[in-house]
Design a protein with these regions (language model features):
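Short hydrophobic alpha-helices and adjacent helix-cap/hinge residues
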Residues: 1-320
C-alpha cells in the first residue's frame, strides 16, 4: 500500500522497570520455548521478527548465548497441547506463549515460568490471579485496554455519516471474544449505537458471516484478535469491501488487509517487550511477582483508498487520538 493511502499515528513505549540479580548458573546457556499460534515463522511475520529483535536488544543471540525452541501449532487445539508438552519435555527455562497458546502452556507445567503475549483478559482466562500480583508460574503482556473500544466506535461515527448499526465478529468458542463483545456493546450504548454479533469459528465461516452482515444492512463491523482466526486476517478486508461494510480493525497487520480504520495496541511492540520478562526471570525474578503489563504503544491507521471505495470522505482534522 502506498504511503499516501494511509495515515499513521503512534504512541510511545514505556519502561518496564529495573533488572534483578543474576540467577542462571555461570556458563549455562538458557533454553527458551516459544509456543506460537500460526503454522510457520513466515505466517507469524512481524511478530516473529519482533520477538527476535527483543532478545537482541538485551544481548541475546539465538544459538550463541540463548537457545530458542519454536513451535507452530497452526491454531489447532490438539497441536497446541502436544507442542506445549514437547517444549516442557525439553527442560526449557522459560516458556513463552502467543495468544491462545497461553492456556495450553499453563496446563503443561506448574514449575517452568510462562510468559504470555497478546492475551486480552488473563484474569478471566484463569491464567493469573490478578494483574498486579499474578501468583503461580505465569505472567506476561496483555493487548487489551477497554478505552480503545470506545475510541474505535467514536472514530467510526465521525467517519461514517448516519452510523447507527455496527456488527461485531465473534468466535463463540473463545472467552476473550465474548469479553470484547460485552465491552463493545457497553461503549456503543453510551454513544447511541447498536451492536449485533455475527459468529465465525473458523476461516470457512468468515464469508457466511459477512454475507449475513450485508443481509442485515450492517454499516460497519469491528473485529478483535480473538474473533478472527489468524489465517483469516488477510481476507476479512476484501470480504468487508466487497459487501460495502466499513471494517474497523485492531492492528496494523489486520489493517493492511483492507480495513477502513485500525486503532489498537501495537502487537509487534508487545512481542518485542516480552523478552524483557524472560530476561528478568533468567536473572532470578519470580513470575508471581512480575505484574502483567498492559500495552504502552498504540497505532492508528486510516485507509484513504478503502474510504474512497466505500464512498466516504475522510476529514482528517476531525479524528483525535
Amino acid at each position: 500500500m502506498r504511503r499516501r493511502e494511509f495515515i499513521t499515528l503512534l504512541g510511545c513505549a514505556a519502561s518496564l522497570g529495573p533488572r534483578v540479580s543474576q540467577a542462571q548458573p555461570a556458563g549455562k546457556i538458557p533454553k527458551i520455548g516459544v509456543l506460537w499460534h500460526a503454522g510457520s515463522a513466515e505466517e507469524e511475520g512481524p511478530y516473529f521478527k519482533a520477538l527476535a529483535e527483543g532478545f537482541r536488544d538485551l544481548g541475546y543471540v539465538d544459538g550463541r548465548n540463548i537457545i530458542l525452541e519454536h513451535r507452530f501449532p497452526n491454531e489447532m487445539p490438539e497441536r497446541f497441547k502436544v507442542m506445549a508438552a514437547e517444549l516442557v519435555a525439553l527442560k526449557i527455562d522459560v516458556l513463552v506463549s502467543v495468544g491462545n497458546g497461553a492456556s495450553y502452556a499453563k496446563n503443561a507445567t506448574t514449575t517452568i515460568p510462562v510468559v504470555f503475549m497478546l492475551i486480552p483478559d488473563p484474569v478471566g482466562a484463569h491464567l493469573v490471579s490478578s494483574l498486579a500480583r499474578p501468583g503461580g508460574n505465569v505472567t506476561g503482556f496483555t493487548n487489551f485496554a477497554a478505552e480503545l473500544v470506545g475510541k474505535r466506535l467514536q472514530f467510526l461515527r465521525e467517519i461514517i455519516p448516519g452510523l447507527s448499526r455496527i456488527a461485531q465478529l465473534v468466535n463463540p468458542n473463545v472467552q476473550a471474544s465474548r469479553l470484547h463483545l460485552d465491552v463493545t456493546r457497553s461503549a456503543a450504548s453510551e454513544i447511541g449505537l447498536s451492536v449485533q454479533a455475527f459468529e465465525a469459528r473458523s476461516v470457512a465461516e468468515l464469508e457466511p458471516a459477512f454475507d449475513a452482515m450485508a443481509a442485515a444492512s450492517m454499516q460497519a463491523v469491528t473485529v478483535n484478535p480473538e474473533g478472527v482466526p489468524f489465517q483469516g486476517r488477510a481476507i476479512i478486508g476484501n470480504l468487508a469491501i466487497s459487501r460495502r461494510i466499513a471494517l474497523c480493525a485492531y492492528s496494523k497487520e489486520t489493517f493492511e488487509s483492507g480495513a477502513l480504520i485500525s486503532y489498537g495496541a501495537s502487537h509487534s511492540a508487545i512481542c518485542r517487550h516480552a523478552p524483557v520478562y524472560v530476561d528478568k526471570i533468567l536473572k532470578g525474578a519470580k513470575p508471581s511477582e512480575l505484574p502483567v503489563q498492559g500495552p504502552t504503544k498504540f497505532e492508528m491507521f486510516l485507509n484513504l483508498k478503502t474510504a474512497k471505495s466505500l464512498g466516504l470522505t475522510i476529514q482528517i482534522g476531525r479524528a483525535h487520538v
